[in-house]
Amino acid sequence: MKKYLLGIGLILALIACKQNVSSLDEKNSVSVDLPGEMKVLVSKEKNKDGKYDLIATVDKLELKGTSDKNNGSGVLEGVKADKSKVKLTISDDLGQTTLEVFKEDGKTLVSKKVTSKDKSSTEEKFNEKGEVSEKIITRADGTRLEYTGIKSDGSGKAKEVLKGYVLEGTLTAEKTTLVVKEGTVTLSKNISKSGEVSVELNDTDSSAATKKTAAWNSGTSTLTITVNSKKTKDLVFTKENTITVQQYDSNGTKLEGSAVEITKLDEIKNALK
């Protein structure tokens, strides 16, 4: 009888050792919130290898992994029905997640999304050569830059989605240029690779009395428009990714009234008239 009980005990012990992350539930694990509105389950106890088991579900796919830490950080992996491989990397401080999808070989990237705690993210899609073909940069405030048709030289189409309207333009290896046209006037917003913004205005009007010129002040992020040597209005491109417009008095010497936030593309065009 004693040998029988010992045998049963040994079998149960072996079963326990073979248990993996698929057995995690609310009783034996802790749920940890992650950037990107994801969650990871972390085992309360270490497994037979002395590590904590991790489990997460992304787009209905279960990802599994282990970690030396019990805070939720680590690397989890899974395989889709089409045999493509998914890898989720959670930073040590839980402030960032990196979700990567690879082809069946596990090396060729298909897509990649890095999400931070402040809700900002960068999402990339790759072509057959492993080069970035599409990219979306989402800021913490929800505004975003979208790039499509990216070529090997870094050029492509660009779009900035702001609150209430969209600016469109082009991407080069050096910068993003977003353009708004109204009559003879072209307003260009340039964003460097480092994120620095500069704005310029070009007017093809041949009449000196109505031709618009503009000066950019990088310190205040303000474009001051002038007509016939008189300042007419200020366009301010704020750090909050909004644009405001404020008029000058008839003499062009001082601002009057209050700055008004632009919420429609037509309002930018009206400011260029």
Curated annotation (Swiss-Prot):
A lipid is attached at C17 (N-palmitoyl cysteine). It is a lipid-anchor. Changing G164S: In strain: PBre. This is Outer surface protein A. The keyword Membrane applies. Residues 1-16 form the signal peptide. Changing D59H: In strain: 42373NY3. Keywords: Cell outer membrane, Lipoprotein, Membrane, Palmitate, Plasmid, Signal. Changing P35S: In strain: CA7. A lipid is attached at C17 (S-diacylglycerol cysteine). The keyword Lipoprotein applies. One of its GO terms (cellular component) is membrane. Its main location: membrane. Induces host (human and mouse) cytokine release by monocyte cell lines via TLR2 and CD14; nonlipidated protein does not stimulate host cells. It is found in: Cell outer membrane; Cell surface. SUPFAM superfamilies: Outer surface protein (SSF51087). Pfam families: Lipoprotein_1. Belongs to the OspA lipoprotein family. Changing V114A: In strain: PBre.
